[in-house]
Amino acid sequence: MAVPDASKVRVRIAPSPTGFAHLGTASTALYNVLFARAGGGTFVLRIDDTDVERNRPEYEVVIYESLHWLGLDWDEGPDKGGPDGPYRQSERLDVYKQHAARLLAEGKAYRCYCTQEELDAERKQAQAEKRPYKYSRRCLGPDAPKDRSVFTVRFKVPGGEVKFEDMIRGAMSFDSGLIGDFIIVKSDGYPTYNFASPVDDAAMKISHVIRGEEHLSNTPSQLMIVDALGYDRPVAFAHMPLILAKDGTKLSKRKHPESNLILYREEGYLPEAVLNYLALLGWNPGTSQEIFTFDELVHAFSFERVQHGGARFDWEKLNWINGEYIRRLDDDELTQRLEPFLPRLDEATIRRAVPALRTRLPKLQAAADLLEYLWTDPPAPSLEPEAADRVGAAIAVLNSVPWEPEAIHESLMALVEKSGLGPNKTFMPIRLAVTGKKISPPIDYTLALLPKDVALSRLRRAAGAEA
């Protein structure tokens, strides 16, 4: 069987604009981009927007913005054009009609006039007889109700085995006789997924189809369409493992917030960290290395080391990877990336806080929690007498020091040494007095980021608020 030149790698993703951008879309896009860039190939974005009821233009925009944020830019697509456009399925309806007409004319497809009630009755009968359901081919026989005006178009499954190569799972084989004649054109004239997708893949010369494992069962039907039309098959497929929630269930848009790609941007995850994590979610590099630049991923990635089973999402691992990326940013870049998350602070204040924040942030949004005391006035804590005394002692040593982290640190450490209580017991009431929280940046920065008079005022207020 003819196949395209394997040296001309062309891959694609084909998301549907029916809701927010899903984490799985980003994962699939990443693996496609890595494969394309490693082979000097082309990455195509196609929009599968034939679901008339659920598609929204704004969701298509969300797909673009999310992929751009991750740096997963495409070479051809609806907004860029290309030699095999249009790249929206809703703009390719004539293409599908022509191909369906051809299959009908060649006897490889037929009109089905069965109503939904009649099809439901067939399914119930199959259930009662405890056999897998497949369409009865009633409309191929003399009893077909051809006087009806509403019909679908079904593909006439030829039978036999459908074989293909999966770069993750190896040689695959399906018995097409178990599939049954499937609908390729719905009663409203729109194509089904298993018809439009292979027609587009063939027309766009897609060499490798890389997608989630939920599409594995679709592959035999799609290859039968390709064969019936006489087109070249893709060189190979790769069906990636599903991303699972921590409890092992499938990641759901309704139940699992981590499935929403926009969440990561809003929470302050760095796009390069998200890509790094997604690459490791189902792929093992075979070494102890866990932090990869994009170029390193391009060179290291291979489908041979992708696991077959689902990959469980792990917030702790993502937070660790994101923290590693944050720590590698220089002061200027970290300041710039923090600014959208700290709109109440000026650039100079953020820059002063950066050295204290760098090692404490699992995500950029966490900076707002740590620095909230800078734009709020937390109530004075109710301290035990001994703790209030420690705050009073701090006021005494801080009154005369230059208001810089190093000087504050030296004076407070002298207080620690004098009291013999240790840093934690000495600093906790000071921290509570200034921020209202038990967690903040290092105490020297916590104080220095406030104007001196404000910091001392809060300390005095707390020292007088004894339980």
Stretch-by-stretch model annotation:
Residues A2-Q127, N218-D232:
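N-terminal Rossmann-like or analogous alpha/beta NTP/dinucleotide-binding catalytic cores
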Residues N32, I63, L103, G107, ...:
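Residue-level signal for inorganic ion chemistry
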Residues V52, L229-D232, A236-P381, T435-A467:
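Catalytic adenosine-cofactor/nucleotide-binding cores of aminoacyl-tRNA synthetases and other
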Residues A6-R12, H256, D295-S302, Q336-P340, ...:
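Short amphipathic alpha-helical segments and their helix-coil junctions
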Residues Y110-H239, L244-L251, N260, Y264, ...:
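Active-site cores that bind ATP or allylic diphosphates and position pyrophosphate for catalysis
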Residues P385-V434:
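C-terminal accessory/binding modules appended to enzymatic or scaffolding proteins
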Residues V11-P17, L45-D49, M204-V209, S259, ...:
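Glycine- and acidic
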